[in-house]
């Protein structure tokens, strides 16, 4: 996809691994970076996303679905989950556009990731769009702890999985209360979702600290993103 910012950027898609406590692959999040036409500048999605039009967000979401279609047998064969971030602007389109809905619904292993800044998230199941999405697709709250939402939507059972925010984790990791605080979160949230995951695992030392705390899966710089051509290497380790 080509995005028109200060100059033209094109999207490049990668797969970000999610591992279990034994460092075995359980799923992959499809992420995008944006590169200038000359390749000299690259930006992550979080910097570009606020400047994308609804049409550009739609094109990026469709581009991710198209990539997922090319490697769906890999996900099925290895029993992996795929996560795609769902921008708020695309939520209603997904429910109203039958073709887009069908393209997403055909993948039984696909789960949609929603950020804490999703409009009306604090309404929980009273948010009609969010409730309808949860009826049709497994949802993941992608950055719990970012400080932009309450726990209502989690306790309302709208999310199959919850991922703790990487910045939240890395800030807390510097405190001596990290382990008991994480135990408290696990105890509070686990009964309201199928899987509680943790991001921000950038080192072996951090993985060793987090692994015994009761999380079901882990994501971070310890397992860098890979292009589609290197997917097979993730299951050969």
UniProtKB/Swiss-Prot annotation:
Residues 1-237 form the EAL domain. Signal peptide: none annotated. Gene3D superfamilies: EAL domain. It comes from the Bacteria. Keywords: Repressor, Transcription, Transcription regulation, Virulence. Acts as an anti-FlhC(2)FlhD(4) factor by binding to FlhD, decreasing its ability to bind DNA, and thus negatively regulates expression of flagellar class II operons, decreasing motility in nutrient-poor medium. Required for resistance to host phagocyte oxidase. Interacts with FlhD in the FlhC(2)FlhD(4) heterohexamer, inhibiting its ability to activate transcription. This is Anti-FlhC(2)FlhD(4) factor YdiV. It comes from Salmonella paratyphi B (strain ATCC BAA-1250 / SPB7). The gene is ydiV.
